[in-house]
């Protein structure tokens, strides 16, 4: 195994990550981070003793956008790291097929028990 996943120093997303599909904008993790941005705007208003929900709506929108944007790239990086790990794992499986024998395929009839309805 490689100790360091990203061999290029100080690269958050290598060029190789561009070949992956982008994360969906409706990903729950992104929506959650956007909500955290909104809550951080509310907490900022609370700390500075402003009206909590109505003061600085532009600031709250900025926090939502910034957190959503940061979450988008964090999810993109996570997907890239999973893709690299999967590529290494499948490469290993391809080089060592004796360690991963094919299992015989079973039908559903062999897996499930016979069904006897209760009258």
Curated annotation (Swiss-Prot):
Transmembrane segments: 56-75
Compartments (UniProt record): Mitochondrion inner membrane
Main localization category: mitochondrion
Keywords from the named record: Electron transport, Membrane, Mitochondrion, Mitochondrion inner membrane, Respiratory chain, Transmembrane, Transmembrane helix, Transport
Membrane association type: Single-pass membrane protein
Coiled-coil zones: none
GO cellular component: mitochondrial inner membrane; respiratory chain complex I
GO biological process entries: mitochondrial electron transport, NADH to ubiquinone
Oligomer status and interactors: Complex I is composed of 45 different subunits. Interacts with TMEM242.
Family indicated by similarity: Belongs to the complex I NDUFC2 subunit family.
Function (record text): Accessory subunit of the mitochondrial membrane respiratory chain NADH dehydrogenase (Complex I), that is believed not to be involved in catalysis but required for the complex assembly. Complex I functions in the transfer of electrons from NADH to the respiratory chain. The immediate electron acceptor for the enzyme is believed to be ubiquinone.
Protein name according to UniProt: NADH dehydrogenase [ubiquinone] 1 subunit C2
